[in-house]
């Protein structure tokens, strides 16, 4: 199983949904970076379950404990281990799923690959695996903010099912996004999104949608062609998040409908800085950041576990019917926002440290 991400700033997540706990080991973090448990906890609180009435009611404090690699609020340059205990797991709700496969979940494919799986709560396929990513993302953020104080990563829910928000990439703020439980910066769309999620939940169904993410203040020069282009590794990072099905940077698929003259971003000088008049490239050209805002869209499928009777099969190849039990998100989008941000920070931090190894910034 590949549970690691990054080359220089490298993370390895561990743990299962209903095991003793989950966490992450970070290797390659520079020394003397200010990091506290409070910094990590702030991000974990944004992704934890039970935070509102439109997410899973599972009650977990998700308290982060730094086990190694940090002393007196500063990183030591040695591996950083962060642990979070699982407390509110009810494995009995998954007894039937030990033999019967949930449609479109990872139950069957894990069995096909490993011949065994941690069936309670989905094991490693559970979104609780992302706790380690979010914790590590907080550390990556600290590394980058030390080098580039103005850099920021802001993600928000742009669409839930058929409800779309109207949000300006350039003006969106973290405070506006956190002002509502669905995490969008469009108040009118937020109300409609919340209503749609509740309606799906009450009927036992689920909804998907789109998260948008903008990176501001990224320096030019990050990215490692040809196989580790910045947009390629961002795609890798985002598509590794549970339930993701699509990724686009800049104009994305809309580029197919444009001419070269329409899509090209003309250059101009702003003092000593090279700028572009448009940003169809989404801040990345030739796989390398150009200093403009990096614009991303990530598509999420509806949650696979439904409280509706569905056709399936069991481990013995017999036809079966299955109705989900347990506690699940009817829509993962509100809690996916901090996960998307964390993966962006991790990707950018790794590329920054790679670049620092090659050339002084």
Swiss-Prot record:
Main enzyme class: lyase
Binding site for FMN: 124-126, 286, 301-305, 327
PROSITE patterns: CHORISMATE_SYNTHASE_1, CHORISMATE_SYNTHASE_2
Listed GO MF terms: chorismate synthase activity; FMN binding
Co-factor requirement: FMNH2
Textual note on the cofactor: Reduced FMN (FMNH(2)).
One Gene Ontology term, aspect cellular component: cytosol
Single Gene Ontology BP annotation: amino acid biosynthetic process
SUPFAM superfamilies cross-referenced by the UniProt entry: Chorismate synthase, AroC
Catalytic activity: 5-O-(1-carboxyvinyl)-3-phosphoshikimate = chorismate + phosphate
EC nos: 4.2.3.5
Record function comment: This reaction introduces a second double bond into the aromatic ring system.
Family of the protein in this entry: Belongs to the chorismate synthase family.
Subunit and interaction comment: Homotetramer.
Annotated protein name in UniProt: Chorismate synthase
GN (gene name): aroC
């Amino acid at each position: 199983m590949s549970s690691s991400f990054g080359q220089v700033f490298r993370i390895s997540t561990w743990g299962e949904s209903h095991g003793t706990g989950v966490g992450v080991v970070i290797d390659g973090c520079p020394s003397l970076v200010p990091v506290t448990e409070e910094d990590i906890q702030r991000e974990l609180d944004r992704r934890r379950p039970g935070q509102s009435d439109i997410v899973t009611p599972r009650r977990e404090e998700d308290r982060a404990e730094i086990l190694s690699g940090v002393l007196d609020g500063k990183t030591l340059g040695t591996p950083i281990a962060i642990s979070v205990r699982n407390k509110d797991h009810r494995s009995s709700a998954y007894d039937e799923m030990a033999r019967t496969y949930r449609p479109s979940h990872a139950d069957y494919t894990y069995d096909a690959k490993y011949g065994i799986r941690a069936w309670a709560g989905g094991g490693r396929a559970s979104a609780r695996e992302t706790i380690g990513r979010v914790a590590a993302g907080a550390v990556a953020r600290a590394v980058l903010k030390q080098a580039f104080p103005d850099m920021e990563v802001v993600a928000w829910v742009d669409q839930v099912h058929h409800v779309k928000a109207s949000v300006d990439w350039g003006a969106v703020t973290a405070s506006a996004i956190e002002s509502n439980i669905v995490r969008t910066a469009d108040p009118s769309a937020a109300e409609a999104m919340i209503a749609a999620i509740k309606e799906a939940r009450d009927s036992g169904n689920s909804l998907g949608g789109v998260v948008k993410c903008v990176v501001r203040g990224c320096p030019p020069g990050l990215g490692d062609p040809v196989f580790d282009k910045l947009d390629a590794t961002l795609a890798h990072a985002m598509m590794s998040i549970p339930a993701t099905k699509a990724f686009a940077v800049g104009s994305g698929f809309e580029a197919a409908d444009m001419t070269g003259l329409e899509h090209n971003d003309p250059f101009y000088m702003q003092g000593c800085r090279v700028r572009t008049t448009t940003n169809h490239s989404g801040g990345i050209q030739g796989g390398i950041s150009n200093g403009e805002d990096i614009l991303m869209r990530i598509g999420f499928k509806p949650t696979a576990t439904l409280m509706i009777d569905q056709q399936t099969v069991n481990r013995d190849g017999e036809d079966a019917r299955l109705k989900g039990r347990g506690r699940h998100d009817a829509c993962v989008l509100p809690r996916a926002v901090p996960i998307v941000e964390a993966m962006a920070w991790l990707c950018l931090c790794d590329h920054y440290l790679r670049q620092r190894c090659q050339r002084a910034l």
